[in-house]
Amino acid sequence: MQSADNLIWIDLEMTGLDVDSCKITEIAAIITDKDLNIIAEAEPIAIYQPDEVLANMNEWCIKTHTETGLTQRVKDSKISTEAAEQQILEFIRKFVPYQSSPLCGNSIWQDRRFLAKYMPNIDEYCHYRMLDVTTLKLLNQYWGDGKSFEKKNTHKALDDIRESIAELKFYRQKLLSI
């Protein structure tokens, strides 16, 4: 049930924001139709990283990933970055033709940088365009009434994608009148 109108939503959790020194610890993906109805969800994948990689996390990552249980899931995982990339790519291919969907999410440019470096096959499969929900959030702050979508910010990849989709629906109704 591939469709060029379907959208690819991805969220990553990482050991930090520096693409040159940090690694991906979790990936999740959701496919929606163009009206933002969820078609399918890929289970989030914790990606194994050795202790020396985890030891280099900043304070925010240590606190957050410990509280969510991600750090332990990463330590216990048997899944490599390459295996996680392959699983997510197989999921995406079921629903979206090659280079037909923009990569969607919040501050998605940051995720895209990590995909380009560590999961280049996913990066290449997505269209070069990106649908960044953060743009609408900022436009609402600058030109709207300032009332923004309230997020739970669980920093769990699948939860974050679901929130991004809900946030885009919120801003679509509020700002776009379409």
From Swiss-Prot:
Pfam families, per database record: RNase_T
The protein's name in its UniProt record: Oligoribonuclease
Active site: 128
Transmembrane intervals: none
Domain Exonuclease residue range list: 7-168
Entry EC no(s): 3.1.15.-
Annotated SMART domains: EXOIII
Keyword rRNA-binding: no
Record carries keyword Transcription: no
Originating organism: Francisella tularensis subsp. tularensis (strain SCHU S4 / Schu 4)
